[in-house]
Amino acid sequence: MSLMDPLADALTNIRNNELQGNDSCVIKPASKLIGHVLSTMQKENYIGNFELVDDGKAGIFNVELVGNINKCGVIKPRHAVKNTEFEDYEKRYLPAKNFGILIVTTPQGVMTHHEAKEAGIGGRLLVYVY
């Protein structure tokens, strides 16, 4: 089976395991982008610890789930957003103001839309989590 979008598959795996009430999940294949998204989700307390395990191929992430995710998904197409336009996409992808995060890739790295707003930079939308 070939994967068309590993990031979308990883988030679907996390969401399905959260809905089943599992304590952990395995994400494969691993990538730098998935690692950065997971670390951003960890900073915002949506997931627990995660570790990269070398399986001789692309690698595997073992992720601890804490039960804080109601829904998460990938944003397609990956819209380019100015720092003044984040509020429009908050209304579109998040259920309420100040509830959930948008994860954005910027020239300074992967961060939440709140951090990007504070830094005054734009980027491309990757993920919504609430």
UniProtKB/Swiss-Prot annotation:
Keyword Amino-acid biosynthesis on entry: no
Query: What Gene3D superfamilies does this protein's entry cite?
Result: 3.30.1370.30, 3.30.1490.10
GO MF, any single term:
structural constituent of ribosome
Give me the Gene Ontology terms describing cellular component. ribonucleoprotein complex; ribosome
Q: Which UniProt keywords apply?
A: Ribonucleoprotein, Ribosomal protein, RNA-binding, rRNA-binding
| Alphabetical GO biological process terms | translation
Q: Pfam families from the xrefs?
A: Ribosomal_S8
| Listed InterPro entries | Ribosomal_uS8 (IPR000630), Ribosomal_uS8_CS (IPR047863), Ribosomal_uS8_sf (IPR035987)
Concerning its family, UniProt says: Belongs to the universal ribosomal protein uS8 family.
Outline what the protein does: One of the primary rRNA binding proteins, it binds directly to 16S rRNA central domain where it helps coordinate assembly of the platform of the 30S subunit.
Q: How does it assemble?
A: Part of the 30S ribosomal subunit.
- Name the chain's protein: Small ribosomal subunit protein uS8
Q: What organism is the protein native to?
A: Methanosphaera stadtmanae (strain ATCC 43021 / DSM 3091 / JCM 11832 / MCB-3)
